[in-house]
């Protein structure tokens, strides 16, 4: 039986005064692309990230270091309000560093920050559409008939009503928690496959895109934990005639967003077409199971683009083509991407490569 939170028992303890001290929850990406966290007490309200200490953890237990040299260091990178504890308590997104001061192998933020600094005059904006699938604690899709299947896809996308959407209360809790925390969440919707949902984060400039998406993911898995529900970011969690899960990446630069920007968008698409394989390499594991040319995807083996074409690698929204400026949508990234890798390679390809 899955463990369930006793929120009614916890509530009076969370209401107790803390004095001047606060709790800071350090959050980091582990060696397998998952999320970990642990808490420390800080003597006063944090107003400057520089006042937070560099901490450490046992990297041999997170697939980030060998046992004989297991200390990995956490350097604070971004702060968000803590929706679980409230008050002045905070969530601290941290980068991971090895004992010799080099970035850990899963610290993709380090490189991305350098890339975004080089491109800052172009003011790159991103908006990520994070799809995910919910499962019961026993591993069955949440809300599906035990040992069976729901009706075929059709009524579930942006659906309303019993039997069409599942776990809306969990999704609403996540949405409100993101707003409280300061995450730039811009929307939610039920997706094409039952028990699949999407939230959108952005627009965010530069390195903040990865920061906001990772923390939004953390809030989602923490809240789902309270519901005794599992969150899957696998790009094809269920085989058969079901949609996969992606993380469509909307991208623009200052020049793209200004009148006449369509020409810049077309130039960017041409550059992206020449590095298709390099992008696919960092666009998520098992993405070949999703990018089949079916279920609103382009084929993983070929680059394509088009206006309003959801079967293309790159989609230009119809309203963007009509007005002559705006943004493009890269539909190739899978739901399990590291956003730092995706946003940095897009900037490298379109802005920094000769």
Swiss-Prot record:
Signal peptide: none
Domain GS catalytic residues, every copy: 108-354
A cellular-component GO term for this protein: cytoplasm
EC number(s) given by UniProt: 6.3.1.2
Gene3D superfamilies attached to this UniProt entry: Glutamine synthetase, N-terminal domain (3.10.20.70), Glutamine synthetase/guanido kinase, catalytic domain (3.30.590.10)
SMART domains xrefs: Gln-synt_C
Entry's Gene Ontology molecular function annotations: ATP binding; glutamine synthetase activity
Compartment annotation: Cytoplasm
Domain GS beta-grasp: 22-101
Keywords: ATP-binding, Cytoplasm, Ligase, Nucleotide-binding
InterPro entries found in the cross-reference section: Gln_synt_N, Gln_synt_N_sf, Gln_synth/guanido_kin_cat_dom, Gln_synth_cat_dom, Gln_synth_gly_rich_site, Gln_synth_N_conserv_site, Glutamine_Synthetase
Family: Belongs to the glutamine synthetase family.
Designated name of the protein: Glutamine synthetase
Species in which this protein is naturally found: Hebeloma cylindrosporum
Native organism taxonomy: Eukaryota, Fungi, Dikarya, Basidiomycota, Agaricomycotina
UniProt gene name: GLN1
